[in-house]
Amino acid sequence: MKNISTIEKHIGNTPLVRLQRLPGNTSNIVLGKLEGNNPAGSVKDRPALSMIVEAEKRGEIKPGDVLVEATSGNTGIALAMVAAMKGYVLKLIMPDNMSLERRQSMQAFGAELILVTAEEGMEGARDLALKMQADGKGKVLDQFANPDNPLAHFKTCLLYTSPSPRDQRGSRMPSSA
């Protein structure tokens, strides 16, 4: 793998591997992206970066702002990493029955954790995030309703012709199935 100058540029720049064992008698070539090789360890790095960058472009947030988000895991870890890279204070709200490893990963990137009860669940976490925003205690990215979340996958990963896979496979393969 080539050297990449910043963590941000590494997000989504994950290896392509050719799947060797396909069912049936086929000559098709199927490539998979190893999204676990993203810096925070999951495909959620893409939408975390997208939600923050697009909100910056719209002038909704700027470095130094407090971001508040409800999460149960990988998106929170990825947001913690991106927030740290870009200079945001991040408060993550999650149910108290989420794994200790997830909590530790978020805190390792500098996020503050606010726990709600397991009974309140993700709905309670999201309600608290929205209340904190209404009270002026932070800005919510709202991964659950934010179009920049799914668009990150559409723009960078799911499209066969997207820049990341297209650049990696070169001109050896067609750009449409």
PLM region spans:
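PLP-dependent amino-acid enzyme catalytic core
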Residues: 1-162
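Single conserved hydrophobic/aromatic residue that forms the stacking wall/gate
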Residues: 160-163, 167-177
